[in-house]
Amino acid sequence: FYVNTPSGIRVYVYGTRFNVSAYESEDYVETVLESGHVSVFMPVYGTSETLNPGERLLFDKKALQFMKSKVDVSEKTAWKDGKLIFRNTSLDEMLKRLSRHFNVDIHFNNKSGKNYTFRATFRNESLFQILDYLSKSVSMKWNVEDPVQLSDGTFTKRKVIVDLY
């Protein structure tokens, strides 16, 4: 079978364990292979790359280039087992992943915090427990804004505002 991403990348899958991360708001499409075999194809340009287990392929949507590297697969696929693993991860990237994992909008007001990196593994902690742990490592405070009901009866996502001080 194959997976089509919004940016036009097609990932052909052959009896594998893999992860594709393809968010519209991100500059990269990431494919990580745990086992088996995948081919990543960009139909518009006729370009393809093949991955071996333990490899990651990033497609830079701006430069239109593939970049292949070795990767700690467990960090990229642990979410499937209910774990979040961060290895040398910036605070900004960590908050993006937490936002996706917990389906909340996290607004990080102080981009100067990109200099902070973390190494952590979370198994069953709630978002608020994780934010409490982070605030013990970094001078950080956070506030939660409840969802707002829209005119059509639906609700916005819960919003979490993170500030460094």
Predicted regions and their residues:
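N-terminal export/assembly leaders
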Residues: 64-165
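Short, small/hydrophobic-biased targeting/export segments
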Residues: 1-63
